[in-house]
Amino acid sequence: MVKEVVLGIDLGTSAIKIIAVDQLGNVIESVSETLKLYQEHPGYSEQDPNEWFEATKKGIKELIQSTEMSDKIVKGISFSGQMHGLVIVDDNGIPLRKAILWNDTRNSIQCRQIEDIYGERLNYNPILEGFTLPKMLWVQQHEPEIWNRVDVFMLPKDYLRYCLTQTIHMEYSDACSTLLFNPENYEWTKDVGDTFNIGDIYPPLVKSHSYVGNVTSSLAKELGLSSDVAVYAGGGDNACGAIGAGVIHDKSALCSIGTSGVVLNVEYQRVTSYDSNLHLFNHSVPDTYYAMGVTLAAGYSLNWLKQTFFENESFEEILNLAASSKIGANGLLFTPYLAGERTPHGDAQIRGSFIGISGQHTKADFARAVIEGITYSLYDSIKIMRRAGHEMNSITSIGGGAKSRFWLQLQADIFNVQIKRLKHEEGPSMGAAILAAYGLGWFKTIESCVEAFIKVDEVFEPNNENHDLYEQYYSVYEAIYKQTKQLTADLLTITN
């Protein structure tokens, strides 16, 4: 019997998920611990780093004490984590304030300050509220008494890993989301930090599969772990999500629909000619990049639909109802800009719209319009990638969009590409587990580990006739942003 396991820990926004995986890729046990989100003012989004650690300890204890783990030995741990979030600590490693998260949009002024010096892109990425550098500038300008005590900055999973090992590192796939890292030469661009008087607060850089220490002996005893559990750096949630979905080769792509939506395209050669708000990041697979587009309110839009119109229906019932409407929702379009939009517009102020409402529209049409609108927004990113010359042989769909055969076929038809669904989907936590398995030497390459662990369950082929019809609706969808940009800005001014 296989007794050795690794733990993959995914620090998300709403929860921490921990899985135990054996050498055959079987998930032996899985636990999840919910997290509190602090949103004290409009545009603010924070979490307490100490609560991440307490939730992780609780989850590991539950997992270790489960019946399924009674004869298992944890040999390694690695991490996946929500990207961009700013954690600042003093010289004792104690957080100086709550972490400012990826979806915090208070720093628009700081983004403009960076643009005034560097233009619209910095280190191959657009300058947007989600990134780490603008968050630093906000703290520096609004909380100088805190900023003056900063010894080092970290990203969320890096702080959590520090709590387990008492060693401080940051790896490439997360560092590239700060605007302070050059993804081409794998170095901090300290001259950028010097421009804004950031100071020497940079953590040491390592690869995603790098060994960074062991769980401290006192913590190992508290958690019920052996004293020799090796810890590996891990990766950003999107890089780990891609690894956990088997998306590691050129011309392979990932569509992930959670609270936000992501389209990620793997590149062996970095492409810098993108004409819009795509991100270019380092993959957790060595010497590999990925381009990424983000829909800020993907699953969030579906949650809003349920809470507002379908409080008593399940998501499955909502999707079945949507499937009963025709392609194009009988002439009803929805833009999922409930929290602004990242790709392609980079606009924190834009708001969503229903366009084309008539007295003939039903709840089924509204449900389908929301599903199609989310998918059109993801298609925006795919269009940009294709214009830059990147082909996609297939897209693996994970998250909420992979739980419905109707939505999977809709993705295939709109994107006009083969869509794959996984046999077992564990998301970024599986990617973290794979990094630990590779780091331990269970496999000679990440590729061989992925091949052993990840299996495809079903493939959806595009319907050309449906795609042609969706293209007509999409051409109208594309025009809505420019037509409503000023209108929604005016409404925000009045409302605020």
UniProtKB/Swiss-Prot annotation:
Write the Enzyme Commission number(s) for this entry: 2.7.1.17
The protein's superkingdom reads Bacteria
UniProt-annotated binding residues for substrate: 83-84
Gene3D superfamilies documented for this protein: 3.30.420.40
Q: Which residues form the active site?
A: 237
- CDD domains xref list: ASKHA_NBD_FGGY_EcXK-like
As its record notes, the protein acts as a catalyst of: D-xylulose + ATP = D-xylulose 5-phosphate + ADP + H(+)
MF terms from GO for this chain are:
ATP binding; D-xylulokinase activity
The record's InterPro entries line, in alphabetical order, gives: ATPase_NBD, Carb_kinase_FGGY, Carb_kinase_FGGY_CS, FGGY_C, FGGY_Carb_Kinase, FGGY_N, Xylulokinase
Q: Which GO terms fall under biological process for this protein?
A: D-xylose metabolic process; xylulose catabolic process
Which residues are tagged with the site Important for activity?
Answer: 10
An example Pfam family from this entry, by short name, is FGGY_C
Keywords associated with the record:
ATP-binding, Carbohydrate metabolism, Kinase, Nucleotide-binding, Transferase, Xylose metabolism
What exactly does this protein do? Catalyzes the phosphorylation of D-xylulose to D-xylulose 5-phosphate.
Q: Which family does it belong to?
A: Belongs to the FGGY kinase family.
Q: What is this protein called?
A: Xylulose kinase
Query: What gene is this protein a product of?
Result: xylB
